[in-house]
């Protein structure tokens, strides 16, 4: 930074405190605790804070040192007070705008503080000094962040002079990085807001990593929440799935709020992610059959997760609820690709046999929030009703969403007879049928949507109910909601409790 300075060269040392202890202003903390204490007292700066961060000696009292009429002073001429040199370019800036950026304010104050006992008066002198021939002091600003381009930095500086400059989604990462370097707090938060409202499969990775880099918890939380809802229905259908960081994926898989159409759909999404990690030259989204053929091509003497390449992926697949996959065709497919260790599949099969022998009782499930069977429906604008029939251990249920008016919805589940199904023979072909009149079920219904960029969540309590085959016992409690948000992510989690 080049600052226009009308002063003559002066001695570097100056007196601080009543004991006339000499200090060097370029070194805020030289080890002289007594002198530092006296200087903090004279400047009305917290001593403990300066010990933690000596740079606060330069910028912590900006608002007190400079009167409001200077900070709000309009630009009187085209001549700049400061020339900032960075990124191979010179930027002309004016003093009233500098104090929105802590970095620029710090550099400016360091120049003013050189041998000067009254920075407030000195600031007035510098502002009034418009004559040519002024000496220049150079303080370079080094920017090593590759995200900060000239365009992004120019946008950040433009925000010093103009309110609400439009920030394009394509440029927001660079502007965020520039705002962080400049310590331009209001602009940084504006960028965070733009990013939180602009989450898509193509932006989620970079926005999440930016949140982690700058420790911006609201941004990382927004990314995690968005992924919980969109991993299976949206990201899991696009090539951008490859870019999802493993850490983020693990957090999402562990979340009890994760939305999926079924456990098998979640498994397919995860298999696709692994395939894309191992085939990073693939430019198009693969067919699921291609993924199955790839994993089937490995030697059969060892399951994929037992291989060196699969060992670090085990924590991801431990998050799956494999006991929720009950269709014989799906289980046979998992055996064929030789992906899971044999012990995992044996345990799943044993649990299924035990449940069938005991009328559907799921003795292996202890916690509804982390082990329940889960199904989901994505309720879009065009739907008035949206339902799906599911089968589990010989019992048939319909999960259903109903739109009552433009903002009113309800969601429930209902036990049905297998003979009531349309095309019944195709639905329960090779499927056991239970003749039990009642089935004890513990369940929870949840609906989530966004309104003005903020998530709304509705849910029932955990309810235990005996489901019969006739009304009213065949129907669950209904989750009734009022919202303008679309789409609505409706999740049904349930366990067949011990009878």
Curated annotation (Swiss-Prot):
Cystine connections: none
Gene3D superfamilies: Potassium Channel Kv1.1, Chain A (3.30.710.10)
Record-linked SUPFAM superfamilies: POZ domain (SSF54695)
Membrane spanning stretches: none
CDD domains: BACK_BTBD16 (cd18492), BTB_POZ_BTBD16 (cd18291)
The BTB domain, residue ranges: 143-199
Pfam families in the cross-refs: BTB_BTBDG (PF23998), BTBD16_C (PF21059)
Protein name per Swiss-Prot or TrEMBL: BTB/POZ domain-containing protein 16
Organism of this sequence: Bos taurus
Gene name tied to this protein: BTBD16
């Amino acid at each position: 930074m080049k600052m226009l300075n009308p002063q003559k060269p002066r001695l570097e040392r100056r007196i601080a405190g009543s004991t006339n202890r000499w200090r060097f202003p370029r070194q805020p903390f030289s080890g002289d605790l007594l002198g530092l204490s006296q200087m903090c007292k004279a400047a009305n700066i917290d001593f403990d804070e300066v010990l933690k961060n000596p740079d606060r000696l330069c910028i912590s009292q900006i608002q007190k040192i400079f009167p409001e009429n200077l900070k709000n002073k309009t630009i009187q001429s085209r001549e700049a007070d400061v020339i900032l040199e960075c990124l191979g370019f010179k930027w002309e800036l004016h003093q009233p705008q500098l104090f929105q950026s802590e970095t620029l304010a710090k550099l400016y104050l360091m120049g003013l503080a050189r041998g000067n006992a009254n920075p407030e008066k000195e600031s007035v002198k510098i502002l009034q000094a418009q004559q040519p021939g002024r000496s220049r002091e150079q303080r370079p600003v080094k920017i090593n962040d590759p995200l900060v381009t000239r365009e992004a930095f120019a946008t950040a500086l433009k925000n010093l002079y103009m309110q609400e400059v439009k920030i394009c989604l394509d440029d927001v990462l660079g502007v965020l990085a520039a705002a962080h370097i400049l310590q331009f707090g209001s602009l940084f938060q504006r960028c965070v807001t733009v990013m939180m409202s602009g989450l898509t499969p193509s932006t989620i990775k970079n926005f999440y990593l930016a949140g982690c880099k700058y420790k911006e918890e609201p941004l990382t939380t927004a990314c995690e929440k968005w992924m919980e809802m969109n991993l299976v229905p949206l990201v899991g259908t696009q090539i951008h799935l490859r870019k999802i960081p493993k850490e983020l994926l693990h957090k999402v898989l562990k979340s009890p709020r994760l939305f999926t159409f079924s456990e098998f759909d979640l498994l397919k999404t995860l298999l696709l992610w692994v395939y894309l990690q191992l085939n990073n030259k693939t430019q198009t989204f693969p067919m699921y059959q291609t993924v199955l053929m790839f994993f089937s091509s490995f030697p059969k003497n060892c399951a994929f997760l037992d291989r060196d390449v699969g060992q670090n992926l085990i924590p991801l697949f431990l998050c799956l609820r494999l006991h929720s996959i009950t269709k014989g065709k799906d289980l046979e497919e998992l055996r064929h690709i030789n992906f899971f260790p044999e012990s995992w599949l044996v345990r799943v099969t044993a649990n299924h046999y035990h449940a069938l022998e005991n009328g559907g009782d799921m003795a292996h499930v202890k916690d509804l929030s982390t082990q329940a069977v889960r199904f989901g429906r994505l309720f879009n604008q065009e739907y008035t009703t949206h339902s799906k029939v599911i089968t589990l251990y010989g019992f048939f249920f319909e999960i259903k969403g109903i739109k009552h008016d433009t903002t009113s919805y309800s969601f429930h589940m209902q036990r049905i007879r297998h003979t009531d199904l349309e095309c019944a023979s195709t639905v329960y072909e090779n499927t056991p049928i239970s003749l039990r009149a009642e089935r004890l079920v513990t369940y929870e219904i949840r609906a989530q949507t966004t309104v003005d960029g903020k998530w709304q969540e509705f849910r029932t309590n955990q309810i235990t109910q005996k489901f019969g085959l006739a009304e009213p016992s065949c129907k669950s409690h209904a989750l009734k909601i009022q919202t303008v948000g679309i789409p609505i992510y409706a999740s049904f989690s349930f366990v067949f409790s011990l009878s």
